[in-house]
Curated annotation (Swiss-Prot):
One of its GO terms (biological process) is methylation. It comes from the Bacteria. Zinc is required for the N-terminal methylation of the mature pilin, but not for signal peptide cleavage. It is found in: Cell inner membrane. Its EC number is 3.4.23.43, 2.1.1.-. This is Prepilin leader peptidase/N-methyltransferase. It is a multi-pass membrane protein. The gene is pilD. Coiled coil: none annotated.
Amino acid sequence: MTLWTFLAMEPAYFITLATVLGLLVGSFLNVVVYRLPIMLERQWQREAHEVLGLPVTEHERFDLCLPASQCTQCGHRIRAWENLPVLSYLALRGRCSACKQRISVRYPLVEVGCALLSMVVAWRYGASVEALVLLPLTWSLLALSLIDHDQQLLPDAIVLPGLWLGLIVNYFGVWVPLPDAVCGAVVGYLSLWTVYWLFKLVTGKEGMGYGDFKLLALLGAWGGWQVLPLTLLLSSVLGALVGVYLLRVRNDSMGTAMPFGPYLAIAGWIAVLWGDEIYASNMQLLGF
């Protein structure tokens, strides 16, 4: 009996394995969410300086691997045992071992969130090809949501590989036939692109960024054109609810910019996982 056969026969072990893997990936996503925007900003500055003929400032190596993680308050280099997902945070009681300043609770929350999402995928699909390819999509959408929330940025470095991966996956018909995936990517991009320009023509303002177009194209590449209506509906409802909360509870102004990427990511993830069931339930309620 192979390991894969064993995991397929014993779903609990696969779910546990996916959950632990989600914790580890969540720890890495914390690094990606913090460092990738800085890396991109430095790259853009360097390219702008080169185009303008200005001196280029050379920085020390800064990527997803180096320098080693350190405390943002005192610069204490985080040791291996201090970097264990969730457990280290609990052992340190949420404080740096050197300066005793509080560590942001967001770090363990991201790790736990990634673990829970991975667990849901494993529970939904079991030990299958669908689960194996959907886990990277889930992690990518989580990273994109956090970066967009923090920086109002959806990096091509994550979006474009995710889009191509969706097309490759559906080349083998994992979710939908390849023509549906290609159509989903094209229609996903053009639908928000059209909304963007109509809004800009009417108001003279930009209602969303180009990253949102590409993110919806990514979701269309994975789930086909069939997931787009549900994704747009759910993301619009989520965005509207959060917008009302920000206006009524936090007293934000109408002009406060609000990233749309997280709502697209949440809605698209739901649509890819449960879109067929949601459509079937709605048709049944309508008597079709």
